[in-house]
UniProtKB/Swiss-Prot annotation:
The organism of origin for this protein: Neocamarosporium betae (Beet black rot fungus)
Cofactor: heme
Pathway(s) the chain acts in: Secondary metabolite biosynthesis; terpenoid biosynthesis
Name of the molecule in the record: Cytochrome P450 monooxygenase btcB
One Pfam family of this chain: p450
Lineage per the UniProt record: Eukaryota, Fungi, Dikarya, Ascomycota, Pezizomycotina
Keyword DNA repair included in the entry's annotation: no
Glycosylation sites (chain numbering): N5, N204, N381, N395
UniProt gene name: btcB
Localization of this protein: Membrane
Protein's job: Cytochrome P450 monooxygenase; part of the gene cluster that mediates the biosynthesis of betaestacins. The bifunctional terpene synthase btcA converts isopentenyl diphosphate (IPP) and dimethylallyl diphosphate (DMAPP) into the sesterterpene betaestacin I. The C-terminal prenyltransferase (PT) domain of btcA catalyzes formation of GFPP, whereas the N-terminal terpene cyclase (TC) domain catalyzes the cyclization of GFPP into betaestacin I. The cytochrome P450 monooxygenase btcB is then responsible for the six-step oxidation of betaestacin I to yield betaestacin II.
Length: 528
């Protein structure tokens, strides 16, 4: 009788999630008492009853979306298996509107209001907070890291502690100190392009930029570059995680049920660090050597260890986890941004010509190019912003949150509901942008100008680095690297895209990350 009290019924008379959970507690006992013949009878009945519940009585039953998505994770698994997640989710929003049900317990929003509600956590409180715990990213964190880091830490106070410890590595003062290291690596990168120009060979510039960013970020992190073989391991594991994404989607669905969810958690925690990723990328011996080296300069680790003077002490595992995470996350986001920006610039040579005019008109020599000067170039920054608007590096299931019970856009989401705010859709929505599907870098140069054709663009809809307490800490570092690489590239070289038949949205895989993007160019040294 207790199961039928008011706590299990919503205000609209429909049962809430507790009723379903009670059924899952009782079901195993019933199954034990059944013989095979009874299972044949009751099995289909249970299946039909479950479908009826999800379609008509579940808390998300009134939210539009594909019927297959409402009753099972198969729709999401199919999209992930097809590696077109961003495009598929946007198609659903185009068809059904700003709020779409994309799984039995998952709802996707495509509004600025939802972006703010979900990612602005209430200080110190659980009520109304949307957490990472129980999401796929949290699940991968349990399987991957020796200790939680600022990407995976779920509780508010624990995350604030780690963020405070890591923050000093990304201060404006540290960025200025780190620039000579960045410039040195870009000079080495340009020597490769010089050789390609002399030999008149085609260059997979995405691959070379990946090597550049890996060397640069690992040097900035630990005072010396990590081996390229570690980058190969990292890329292999990225592909593995994305290949496993359909199965991980099933596991996340199972986590919402008490018995099955508890069993899944037990399996995951019983085999910790399945991928051993941080120790593969940053061996413990390398970390120890870095910490003991007397000549440590302006690397991330020095800044993080320096935070101990403020009373924030990280364990060896926490140092390893956070240091490796900074390299790995920064690597993927920075390379994606560089590759996508060059892709758009070279698809329309006029865009590249306009940017070359700006950069070459501002500087007389490559030596004059520095972080402070290029931060003020409107078209350079507009070219980068526009690429990230159309192809946000952070979009995907990694930005999902789990509701603890709260409202988003006037819709109450009970505890246990997975909430997605789809940046890919928002940043391409005609509701917020003029000419939303077209690469228009000039829209950013005209911000604040009256009577501009882009004056009604809603810039709060542009959040490639997220917002709130979990906004990307390395945002300014990533932008500084991208600006420096592009500015020196367009100043010194003329590039022509060779693989012009490559279409990013059609040919790239999108699930947890963008995979498979490749820009191949012919390089010509700029005439004096």
């Amino acid at each position: 009788m207790d199961a039928m009290n008011g706590s299990d019924v919503q205000s609209d008379g429909l049962p809430n999630g507790n009723t379903l959970q009670l059924a899952y507690h009782v079901m195993p006992r019933l199954v034990q008492d059944m013989g095979p013949s009874l299972l044949l009878i009751f099995g289909p009945l249970v299946l039909v009853s479950s479908c009826i519940y999800y379609l008509f009585f579940h808390p998300l039953s009134k939210i539009p979306g594909p019927k297959l998505a409402a009753i099972s994770p198969v729709w999401m698994m199919k999209s992930l298996y097809g590696k077109k997640l961003n495009r598929d989710i946007k198609a659903l929003h185009d068809r059904y509107g700003d709020v779409v049900r994309v799984g039995p317990n998952t709802v996707s929003f495509a509004t600025v209001g939802a972006l703010s509600s979900v990612h602005h956590e209430k200080a110190g409180g659980d009520d109304g907070t949307f957490t990472k715990e129980g999401t796929i990213e949290w699940l991968l964190g349990l399987m991957t890291w020796p200790a939680q880091n600022i990407l995976t830490k779920t509780d508010v106070k624990g995350h604030a502690r780690l963020r405070k410890a890591v923050q000093p590595a990304f201060s404006a003062k540290e960025l200025r100190k780190q620039e000579p290291i960045e410039q040195e690596w870009i000079t080495k990168f340009n020597r490769l392009l010089d050789a390609a120009a002399v030999d008149n060979t085609e260059v997979n510039i995405t691959e070379h930029m990946s090597h550049l960013v890996w060397d640069m970020l690992s040097d900035l992190s630990f005072g010396e570059p990590l081996a390229r073989s570690q980058l190969v391991k990292f890329n292999r594991l990225k592909w593995l995680a994305c290949a496993m994404s359909p199965m991980l989607e099933v596991m996340q669905s199972i986590l919402t049920f008490p018995i099955a969810g508890a069993f899944t958690r037990w399996i995951v925690t019983s085999f910790p660090q399945v991928f051993q990723l941080p120790r593969d990328i940053l061996p413990t011996g390398t970390l120890r050597t870095t910490l003991e080296r007397a000549d440590r300069g302006h690397d991330f680790l020095s800044a993080i260890v320096g935070a101990q003077e403020k009373g924030i002490v990280l364990s060896q595992d926490e140092l390893q986890s956070n240091s490796a995470m900074l390299v790995m996350v920064g690597q993927d986001a920075t390379v994606t941004c560089l590759s996508s920006t060059l892709y758009f610039l070279l698809r329309d040579p006029q865009h590249m010509a306009n940017l070359q005019d700006e950069v070459r008109g501002q500087f007389k020599s490559e030596d004059e190019i520095n972080g402070l000067a290029i931060a003020r170039l409107p078209l350079l920054n507009g070219s980068i912003n526009e690429a990230m608007r159309l192809l946000s590096p952070a979009n995907g299931t990694g930005t999902h949150r789990l509701s603890n019970g709260g409202f988003v856009e006037g819709i109450y989401l009970p505890a246990g509901i997975t909430v997605a705010v789809d940046q890919y859709t928002i940043q391409r929505s005609p509701k917020y942008w003029r000419d939303p599907e077209t690469y228009r870098p000039e829209r950013w140069a005209s911000v604040g100008e009256p009577e501009s054709e882009f004056e009604n663009d809603v810039h709060s809809a542009y959040r490639p680095f997220l917002l709130g307490p979990r906004a990307c800490l390395g945002r300014e570092l990533a932008l500084q690297i991208v600006r420096l690489v592009l500015a020196r590239l367009v100043f010194s070289y003329d590039l022509r895209m060779v693989n012009r038949d490559f279409v990013w949205e059609r040919d790239c895989d999108s699930s947890y990350l963008w995979l498979g993007h490749k820009v191949v160019v012919k390089v010509q040294k700029r005439e004096s």
